[in-house]
Amino acid sequence: MSGVENPLFGAEQLQRELAGAKPPLLLDVRWQLVAKRPEDAAHPVGYGDFLEAHLPGAVFIDLAQDLAGHGEPVDGRHPLPTPEDFAASVARWGLAEGQEAVVYDDQGGMSAARAWWLLKLFGAHDVALLDGGMAKWVAENRPTESGISSFAKSRAPWR
C-alpha cells in the first residue's frame, strides 16, 4: 500500500494484506445521527454495530469524539479537532507513525472519508478507504469478528 495514489483499497487485496507480516490497522468509523436500538443510546452511535460484527482486528472510531473538535455551537456539529486532540485519538487507536491504515464505514463512505481526510491532513501517508465498506465485505462473505478487538496501542506520540 506504500505510496497510495488511489485512496480505495479492494476487499480481496485487504484480506491478503491482513494475512501478511505487516497488516494494516483497520479503523471502523460506522456512525449515524441517531442510535438504531434503544440499548445503543448509552454508547457512541455505531458502537453497537461494531460489537456485533467488524473486520478482524478493527478498532472502533467514534466520529463525534475522535474526528471532531468540541468548541462553541457556532463552530458547527463536527468542527475539526485540534492537532493535539487528534494525535491523542490516533495514539489511542494504536496507529504508529508510518503504519498503514484502512478506514471503513457502512454509510457509503461519508464517515470513513472524514477519517481518511483527517489522517491525511495531519500527516499520515499510507491510509486508504475500503472500497464498498462493511456492506461489501459482508456481502462477499469475508471474515468478521464480534466484541472488542485486542490491539497494541501506539507507544510513541503520533505527530
Model-derived features with residue positions:
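Cytosolic catalytic domains that perform sulfur/thiol-centered chemistry
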Residues: 1-159
